[in-house]
């Protein structure tokens, strides 16, 4: 078997695939870049993972695609989950993501389009924040992750 030191070295070198739960410390904030896939289960798991990171917890969430006729309710349930599990601010953008913001109640802030969201980010995000960016790949939230990385 492997020694504890060998296991620790291996884990330290681990890199996620693509934009799946990649943690990036920018010097301004900690970005959890998870722009590859989104569904209620993976969104809840990503929200749960924030608990291990210290700082104000912010989620920037987009549409979960291919959810069928229950899509509004499924999106709303993610917002409710975020608010109930210590997320301080839930920022959303997307036609269905507005239901996430509704579910988050007073913690929710919805932006109707990408330009308005990107313009608001410097005011919404603060030094030391832990920022989860998560949406289905088709929502192209990698652009938002790149902007978060540039904040200072």
PLM regions with names:
Residues 1-152:
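ATP-dependent carboxylate-amine ligase
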């Amino acid at each position: 078997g492997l020694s504890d030191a060998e296991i620790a070295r291996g884990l330290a070198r681990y890199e996620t695939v693509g934009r799946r739960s990649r943690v990036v410390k920018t010097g301004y904030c900690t970005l959890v870049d998870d722009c590859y896939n989104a569904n209620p289960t993976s969104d809840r798991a990503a929200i749960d993972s924030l608990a291990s990171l210290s700082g104000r917890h912010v989620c920037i969430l987009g549409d979960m695609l291919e959810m069928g006729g229950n899509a509004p309710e499924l999106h709303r349930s993610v917002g409710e989950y975020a608010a109930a599990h210590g997320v301080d601010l839930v920022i959303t953008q997307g036609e269905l993501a507005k239901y996430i913001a509704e579910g988050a109640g007073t913690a929710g802030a919805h932006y109707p389009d990408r330009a308005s969201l990107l313009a608001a980010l410097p005011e919404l995000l603060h030094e030391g924040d832990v920022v989860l960016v998560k949406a289905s790949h088709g929502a192209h939230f990698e652009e938002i992750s790149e902007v978060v990385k540039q904040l200072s």
